[in-house]
Regions:
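Short acidic-glycine-tyrosine-enriched beta hairpin
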Residues: 19-22, 49, 62-81
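Glycine- and acidic-residue-biased ligand/ion/polar-headgroup-sensing regions
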Residues: 45-57
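Residue-level recognition of well-ordered beta-strand positions that form the cores
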Residues: 28-30, 56-58, 95-97
Length: 183
C-alpha cells in the first residue's frame, strides 16, 4: 500500500508485472472527496479497465464523459485519452487493470506517490516539469500525457529530460522504492 497525502490517494497493488509474468497489473485505488483529478493521459500499449467498488467515479474516456456508480465497469482501449476523478462527497474506491503488465507502472506510482509524501507536488497534485519529463522518459511505454501532441513530446521531452537529469532529477529514487506486495 502506498499513500499520496498531497492528492488524497491510496493505492494497493494486487498484481504486478513480476507476480503475473507480465500479463496483468491490478490495483485498488482509494480517493478522498475533493482528491486529485488525474490529468488526461494515454496508455500507448495497454488496455485499462475500471470497476467502481464504492463512490462516484467521474471519468472522461475519449469523447465520452460521465459518472459511474458502484458495480459499473468501464474499459479504455489502448491509446485513448482518459482522465478520472472522485465525483462524489464520499471516498471513491475503484479496482483497475492494465493488460499487459509493465514494470514501468510500478516505477511511475512509486515515484509519484513518493514525491507526494515528500511534499514535492504542486497544490493541484502535479509533478514539477523537469521531474515529470525525466519520469515520463522512463515510463513512456506505460503512460504519456494526452497533450502536447506526441510528435512535440518526442522532440522536446528528451531535451528537457537531459536538463532535468543534469539538475539531479531521477525517474526512480531508492528512498521511494517499495517492496511490492500483492494479494
Amino acid at each position: 500500500m502506498i499513500e499520496s497525502p498531497q492528492t488524497g490517494e491510496t493505492l494497493i497493488f494486487r498484481s504486478t508485472a513480476d507476480s503475473s509474468n507480465g500479463e496483468l497489473f491490478r490495483a485498488e485505488l482509494f480517493v478522498k472527496p475533493g482528491g486529485y483529478v488525474v490529468r488526461a493521459h494515454i496508455h500507448p500499449s495497454q488496455e485499462e479497465s475500471f470497476v467502481v467498488l464504492a463512490g462516484k467515479y467521474g471519468y472522461q474516456i475519449g469523447d465520452r464523459k460521465g459518472v459511474a456508480q458502484a458495480g459499473e465497469t468501464l474499459v479504455c482501449p489502448v491509446g485513448v485519452s482518459h482522465s478520472q476523478w472522485n465525483a462524489g462527497d464520499s471516498p471513491l474506491r475503484i479496482y483497475y487493470e492494465h493488460r499487459p503488465a509493465l514494470t514501468s507502472a510500478e516505477i511511475f506510482f512509486e515515484t509519484q506517490f513518493g514525491l507526494s509524501r515528500d511534499g514535492k507536488l504542486s497544490p493541484k497534485g502535479d509533478i514539477n516539469l523537469l521531474q515529470g519529463v525525466v519520469l515520463l522518459q522512463e515510463v513512456g511505454d506505460f503512460i504519456r500525457p494526452s497533450s502536447p501532441p506526441v510528435a512535440l513530446q518526442n522532440a522536446l521531452f528528451p531535451v528537457l529530460a537531459r536538463l532535468g537529469r543534469m539538475r539531479g532529477y531521477r525517474a526512480r529514487y531508492q528512498k521511494y522504492a517499495l517492496p511490492i506486495e500483492t494479494e
